[in-house]
Amino acid sequence: PVTSITLGDIDKALALEGESQFTTKCAACHKMDKRKIGPPMAGIMSRRSPEWIMNMILNPDEMVKENAQAKALLAEYLSPMANQSLTEPEARQILEYFRQYDNTNN
């Protein structure tokens, strides 16, 4: 599991890659600004830690077994998050996209 992430200034190139990853791997179930099959992602950086987000992207099955917040999301949305088999660098790109989105839209 990801235990520590150091965040600096927003990396726009990394965020652009993350937007592409999100569109390809996540947008079937998630929208940024409203509920779909899964929860909206807007504001995620203020609701969850970067480590939590990375672990949920990388290993949603384990998170739903072990993490109370992930269990609560499953109970609310009734559909487990699919494991997209993303690498840690790909998950980091998505995290950066979330950071940029929240920074721009808040």
Predicted regions span which residues?
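C-terminal capping alpha-helices of c-type cytochrome domains
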Residues: 51-56, 79-106
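Gly/Gly-Pro-rich "capping" loops immediately C-terminal to redox-active cysteine motifs
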Residues: 15, 19, 31-62
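Short, cysteine/histidine-rich loop/knuckle motifs that typically chelate Zn2+
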Residues: 28
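Short pre-active-site segment immediately N-terminal to redox-active cysteine/selenocysteine motifs
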Residues: 14, 22-25, 33, 37, ...
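Sequence context of c-type cytochrome heme-c attachment sites
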Residues: 2-5, 31, 71-73, 80
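Residues at helix-coil transition
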Residues: 23, 31, 58-59, 96-100
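Axial heme c-ligation environment in periplasmic c-type cytochrome domains
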Residues: 37-44, 61-91
